[in-house]
Every structure is written in structure tokens, then in C-alpha cells.
């Protein structure tokens, strides 16, 4: 807490992360409620539960891409603006309760969650560069606490907004967009402080599919060594449990 109060850049990054994470979590529970309100609610709720897990599959790849991103400061800012636009787009189409619209909203939610993981990876090198090594553990711990707080608070706020607006899903999506935009504006105002260690990345001719396969193979090897089970089987179990729960 002392680091948050005394270190201006860490405070800015933390506030931005809190707003961005809250924006990511606000719509999670609300989306399940929206799915349950559709005429095809059984398949809709099933899909809504599935898409909350799918971004996990891209976590390692997104983390690597975040490390390789050269303009981390600028990228964090524009990604937040993109997420804001995505939810404004949701707000404009969510009134139409058909399957095509619902499938489109599912894809937007997946993209937004993946982008949230990406921005989290972009913030980390900035923290590492600007905070002394002996304070990094405190910074990481407080960052995890903020993520946990934004998870609980974001979903609770989403339900409250939905209740007070009499299930106006478009209104909640607009509020969600506002959180992402505010997160980016905070960083834009302090963009000159967002310094980090520059990275040099060699141009690779490996395709996206090949990179994903290589990352998955490495993850599966590590998982088998530690758990003696297949990563794919464990993911399928998690998906089924999440859907049934």
C-alpha cells in the first residue's frame, strides 16, 4: 500500500489496471444473465459459459507477444480505446435477440478478454523498469490484490447496473466501454512516464499456427511432468465443469 501511495507511476498503472480489469469483469456475469434471457437460452448459456474459459488458451501466446511488442506504452493506450469501441458496438446491436447477434457478441467478448491479458503483459515490463528490485514483490502482490478486487467489484457493479437500469444490457455495455476509455485516458495523460527497457526482436518467418502449436506443446510437456496428465484433458474437464456449474 505504501508503494501505491508514494510511487506516482505505480499508482497510475494500478488505477488504469483497476479500471481496465473492472471493465473486463463487469460484463462477465451480466453476459450470462443476457444469455438466459434469449429465446434459445439453453444453447446461449452454454456458449456464454464456454467463452469465459476460451481466452485462457491464448494466455501464453499473448504474454509472449506482449514481451515482443516494441511500443508498449502506445499499445496499452490504443488497445483500451479499441476495447471501448468494441463494447460500444455491442451496445448498438444487443437489442436484436437473434443467434447471429449473440454469436457476434461472444466473439467480441473473447477478443476483449484476450486484449485485457495482452495489456496486463504490456504493463509488467514498465513496472519492472521503474520500480526497484527490492520493491517488486510488493508491487506484484498489490497488483494481484487489485485484480482480485476488480474481479469481485466489477461483477457486483455489473449486476447493480443491470438491476438499476431494469436489465438494460445496452446501458451496461456503454458503462463498460467507459471504464476502458477512462483507463486509456489516465495512461495517455501520463504517457511520458511510461518508460521501459527496449527489446530487439528478430523477424521470424514462423506462422501464427506454428507458434501456437509450439507453445501448446511446451505447456503440455510441463503439465505432464508436474501433474502426469494431459493439458488438453484438463482443459476439457474445466470447460465441462464450468458449463455444468
Regions found by a protein language model. Give the residues of each.
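Juxtamembrane intracellular "pre-TM" segments in multi-pass secondary transporters
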Residues: 1-10, 193-235
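Helix-loop interface residues and adjacent transmembrane-helix termini in multi-pass membrane transporters
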Residues: 7, 38-39, 68-69, 130-133, ...
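Short amphipathic helix-loop junctions that connect adjacent transmembrane helices
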Residues: 29-43
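Short helix-capping/hinge motifs at transmembrane helix termini and TM-loop junctions
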Residues: 40, 93-98, 162, 166, ...
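C-terminal ends and interior cores of transmembrane alpha-helices
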Residues: 81-99
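Helix-loop junctions on the cytosolic side of multi-pass membrane transporters
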Residues: 173, 178-204
Amino acid at each position: 500500500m505504501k508503494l501505491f501511495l508514494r510511487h506516482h507511476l505505480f499508482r497510475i498503472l494500478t488505477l488504469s489496471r483497476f479500471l481496465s480489469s473492472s471493465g473486463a469483469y463487469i460484463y462477465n456475469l451480466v453476459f450470462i444473465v443476457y444469455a438466459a434471457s434469449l429465446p434459445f437460452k439453453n444453447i446461449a448459456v452454454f456458449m456464454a459459459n464456454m467463452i469465459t474459459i476460451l481466452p485462457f488458451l491464448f494466455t501464453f501466446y499473448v504474454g509472449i507477444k506482449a514481451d515482443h511488442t516494441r511500443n508498449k506504452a502506445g499499445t496499452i493506450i490504443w488497445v483500451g480505446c479499441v476495447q471501448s469501441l468494441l463494447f460500444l458496438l455491442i451496445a448498438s446491436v444487443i437489442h436484436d435477440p437473434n443467434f447471429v447477434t449473440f454469436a457476434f457478441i461472444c466473439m467480441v467478448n473473447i477478443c476483449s478478454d484476450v486484449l485485457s491479458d495482452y495489456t496486463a503483459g504490456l504493463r509488467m515490463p514498465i513496472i519492472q523498469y521503474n520500480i526497484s528490485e527490492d520493491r517488486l514483490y510488493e508491487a506484484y502482490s498489490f497488483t494481484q490484490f487489485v485484480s482480485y478486487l476488480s474481479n469481485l467489484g466489477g461483477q457486483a457493479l455489473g449486476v447493480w447496473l443491470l438491476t438499476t437500469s431494469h436489465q438494460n444490457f445496452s446501458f451496461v455495455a456503454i458503462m463498460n466501454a467507459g471504464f476502458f476509455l477512462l483507463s486509456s485516458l489516465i495512461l495517455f495523460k501520463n504517457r511520458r512516464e511510461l518508460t521501459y527497457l527496449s527489446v530487439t526482436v528478430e523477424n521470424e518467418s514462423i506462422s501464427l499456427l506454428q507458434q501456437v502449436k509450439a507453445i501448446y506443446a511446451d505447456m503440455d510437456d510441463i503439465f505432464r511432468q508436474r501433474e502426469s496428465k494431459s493439458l488438453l484433458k484438463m482443459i476439457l474437464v474445466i470447460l465441462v465443469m464450468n458449463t455444468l456449474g
